[in-house]
């Protein structure tokens, strides 16, 4: 009995250290051999919440006492404290008891039967996946060290895979292909933009553990095969693709008729700004008289990369965006002449002083919207220093910023929303998007948006 009392005392002490609300009595869970089943855990947690007996942290200590012995409480609570101090979205964190119950139920439903409950790391990962899933931020992710390395590799522009760019469709809980790299493995196998990935190697997304895990299954060693199941306009299709080493080019360009420079930016990755510079230099050498920047289906990427590219277009010391962390004063990014390392840097105070047109659509999001809104604001909203017309459709409307925080002991990370951001005009567009100057709906039979962009560039040149 003394041992049990010491155990309970230790649990209470740990709860006091990490809890942000009043400490309440935690009853002895009894005989774990008899009661440590997922049904008992679920029932006891639900009863706990209904009776308002415990605060948020207590539920997890209670869960541990009911038979899930080996999760890393220090790691879990470290991440919880990061969320509490930094999370800045909507009304903030949800009600702690409700969130706790949802997290436990999600853990039981999705992980309890599929993990080794004696594996400390596996249990902790599962709890943190569930924690983040239920926080209320659709842009929040928990990643293990391996998953985070894969994520960084993807944003570096080099990775092993099949040559597609995707985004998570939250409404349909599936993965939308928004770009297929020309002449890549997926392109050769027949995958298309607009396909919805619903399975990999015979397993559904739920069976794979969700969005991030599904992406990890698509990737693999070059030369190996993967079968991707897609929904194409209601038809279920299995397509086998042979993986290859993918070096992604996020910027493509060409000189159109009348010497109109066309630059397509598919995402904002580590190597995108350098590629953009090369594209502009090449088109300048070809005598471009104006530019069309195409950011349709661009889901965003690194804010810093968007700032670097804008720095190559606008003069120095122009505000690009402002943002504000929880409890802190407002900060801002400005254009600069030394934004990248020297080996691929934007050297010198380069300015594009030719007419410009941007093409955007409903999948232009996040950092891509920073690009659109900042240039728009310098066409008369805050200063009138460029000639610009925006063509296409209303953008996605993601006017928030996510940051990533790591746990140094094992390399895992959490990413979640930390601030809203505003373009130079200081008008946030989250949930609203950016309206084009000239609305043109995309037509699958042709590219009416590009045709109109060419028309608008001609108008600007003839003013």
Q: What are the residue ranges of the model-derived segments?
A:
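Terminal peptide-recognition signature
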Residues: 59, 127, 131, 164, ...
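Gly/Ser/Thr-rich loop/hinge elements
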Residues: 150-152, 236, 247-251, 300-359, ...
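Bacterial signal peptide processing site
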Residues: 24-27
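Conserved PDZ fold ligand-binding element
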Residues: 84-85, 186-210, 291-294, 378, ...
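Extended, small/polar residue-biased N-terminal targeting/export presequences
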Residues: 53, 64-171, 225-226, 233-240, ...
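C-terminal, low-ordered peptide segments at domain boundaries
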Residues: 181, 187-192, 199-289, 311, ...
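PDZ/PDZ-like domain segments forming the peptide/carboxylate-binding groove
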Residues: 147, 155-199, 203-207, 269-273, ...
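C-terminal motif of bacterial Sec signal peptides marking the signal peptidase cleavage site
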Residues: 19-22
């Amino acid at each position: 009995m003394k041992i049990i009392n010491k155990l309970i005392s230790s649990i209470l002490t740990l709860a006091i250290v990490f809890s942000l609300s009043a400490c309440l009595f935690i009853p002895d869970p009894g005989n774990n051999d008899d009661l440590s089943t997922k049904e008992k855990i679920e029932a006891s947690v639900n009863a706990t919440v209904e009776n308002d007996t415990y605060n948020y942290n207590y539920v997890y200590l209670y869960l541990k006492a009911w038979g899930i012995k080996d999760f890393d409480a220090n790691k879990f609570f470290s991440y919880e404290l990061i969320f509490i101090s930094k999370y800045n979205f909507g009304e903030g964190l949800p009600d702690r008891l409700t969130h706790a119950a949802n997290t436990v139920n999600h853990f039981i439903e999705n992980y309890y039967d599929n993990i080794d409950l004696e594996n400390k790391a596996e249990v902790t990962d599962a709890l943190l996946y569930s924690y983040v899933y239920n926080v209320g931020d659709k842009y929040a992710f928990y990643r293990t060290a391996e998953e985070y390395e894969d994520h960084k590799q993807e944003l570096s522009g080099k990775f092993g895979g099949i040559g597609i760019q995707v985004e998570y469709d939250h409404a349909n809980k599936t993965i939308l292909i928004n770009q297929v790299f020309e002449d890549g493995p997926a392109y050769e196998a027949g995958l298309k933009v607009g396909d919805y990935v619903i399975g990999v190697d015979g397993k559904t997304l739920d069976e794979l553990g969700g969005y991030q895990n599904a992406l990890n299954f698509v990737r693999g060693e070059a030369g190996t095969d993967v079968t991707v199941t897609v929904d194409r306009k209601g038809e279920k299709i299995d397509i086998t693709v042979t993986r290859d080493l993918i070096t992604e080019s996020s910027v493509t360009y060409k000189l159109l008729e009348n010497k109109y420079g066309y630059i397509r930016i598919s995402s904002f990755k580590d190597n995108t700004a350098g590629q953009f510079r090369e594209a502009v230099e090449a088109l300048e050498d070809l005598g471009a008289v104006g530019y069309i920047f195409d950011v349709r289906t661009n889901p965003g990427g690194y804010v810093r990369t968007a700032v670097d590219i804008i720095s190559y277009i606008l003069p120095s010391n122009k505000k690009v965006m402002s943002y504000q962390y929880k409890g802190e004063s407002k900060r801002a990014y400005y254009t600069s002449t030394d934004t990248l390392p020297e080996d691929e840097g934007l050297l010198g105070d380069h300015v594009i002083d030719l007419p410009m047109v941007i093409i955007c659509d409903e999948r232009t999001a996040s950092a891509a919207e920073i690009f659109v809104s900042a240039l728009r604001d310098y066409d008369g909203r805050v200063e009138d220093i460029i000639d610009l017309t925006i063509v296409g459709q209303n953008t996605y409307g993601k006017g928030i910023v996510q940051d990533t925080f790591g746990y140094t002991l094992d390399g895992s990370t959490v990413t979640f929303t930390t601030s809203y951001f505003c373009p130079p005009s200081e008008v946030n567009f989250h949930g609203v998007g950016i309206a084009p100057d000239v609305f043109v709906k995309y037509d699958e039979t042709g590219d009416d948006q590009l045709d109109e962009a060419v028309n608008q560039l001609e108008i600007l040149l003839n003013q």
